[in-house]
UniProtKB/Swiss-Prot annotation:
<keyword id="KW-0749">Sporulation</keyword>
<dbReference type="GO" id="GO:0030436">
    <property type="term" value="P:asexual sporulation"/>
</dbReference>
<protein>
    <recommendedName>
        <fullName>Small, acid-soluble spore protein P</fullName>
    </recommendedName>
</protein>
<comment type="similarity">
    <text>Belongs to the SspP family.</text>
</comment>
<feature type="compositionally biased region" description="Basic residues">
    <location>
        <begin position="30"/>
        <end position="48"/>
    </location>
</feature>
<feature type="compositionally biased region" description="Basic and acidic residues">
    <location>
        <begin position="1"/>
        <end position="19"/>
    </location>
</feature>
<dbReference type="Pfam" id="PF08179">
    <property type="entry name" value="SspP"/>
</dbReference>
<dbReference type="InterPro" id="IPR012614">
    <property type="entry name" value="SASP_SspP"/>
</dbReference>
<dbReference type="GO" id="GO:0030435">
    <property type="term" value="P:sporulation resulting in formation of a cellular spore"/>
</dbReference>
<feature type="region of interest" description="Disordered">
    <location>
        <begin position="1"/>
        <end position="48"/>
    </location>
</feature>
Length: 48
């Protein structure tokens, strides 16, 4: 009983934390990097 409960608890906690932590930082980092790069290039040209 203890072994089954521990396995289920860890399994349910793993996907929940991974799903909430992986897509957020990955999407945010990619979106921010892409947006920052395009904005900086555009801003640099306009500023200069």
């Amino acid at each position: 009983m203890t072994n089954k409960n521990t396995g289920k608890d860890i399994r349910q906690n793993s996907p929940k934390e991974h799903q909430s932590g992986q897509p957020e930082p990955l999407s945010g980092s990619k979106k921010v990097k892409n947006r920052n790069h395009t904005r900086q290039k555009h801003n640099s040209h306009h500023d200069m």
